[in-house]
């Protein structure tokens, strides 16, 4: 709709950088698209992949992040990338696990081990990492209600 952001300040959750130029921001997928694809999204049809790529039902699925930090993350998993902001690391792991659980994405054993080790090393509260069945139901309902939002003319 040709709208542009005229100004503002944004706090990057990954690095705690305070940004004043919208062009420094990028939208990051908590679970990178490539990671999602190899973790199970390759089985999905176009509409589900499109919905995953644009999902707004869970506020931590898409993150407004400092572009340089997002580029450093790339398509890495927690075994090779963690955000530098120490106070955000446990939340980052929780959000990543939530997205994986919601979308039925798998983990390689090395990724699962790295996450388990990080939870211990960072002294994350294991109970805070739990995801309730009610949360999953709520998000699953949102997914089902919005599965037709992407281009309906595209044929698998």
Model-identified regions with their sequence ranges:
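Long, compositionally biased stretches
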Residues: 1-11
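Domain-level detector of nuclease and nuclease-like folds
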Residues: 10-154
């Amino acid at each position: 709709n040709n709208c542009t952001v005229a100004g503002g300040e944004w706090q990057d959750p990954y690095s705690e950088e305070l940004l004043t130029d919208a062009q420094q921001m990028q939208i990051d997928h908590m679970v990178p698209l490539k990671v999602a694809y190899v973790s199970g999204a390759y089985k999905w049809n176009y509409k589900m992949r499109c919905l995953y790529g644009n999902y707004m039902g869970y506020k931590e699925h898409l993150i407004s992040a400092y572009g340089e930090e997002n580029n450093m993350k790339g398509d890495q998993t927690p075994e090779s990338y963690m955000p530098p902001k120490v106070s955000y690391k446990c939340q980052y792991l929780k959000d990543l696990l939530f997205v994986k659980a919601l979308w039925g994405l798998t983990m390689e054993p090395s990724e699962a081990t790295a996450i388990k080790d990080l939870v211990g090393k960072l002294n994350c509260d294991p109970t805070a990492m739990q995801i309730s069945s009610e949360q999953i139901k709520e998000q699953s309902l949102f997914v089902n209600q919005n599965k037709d939002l992407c281009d309906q003319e595209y044929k698998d």
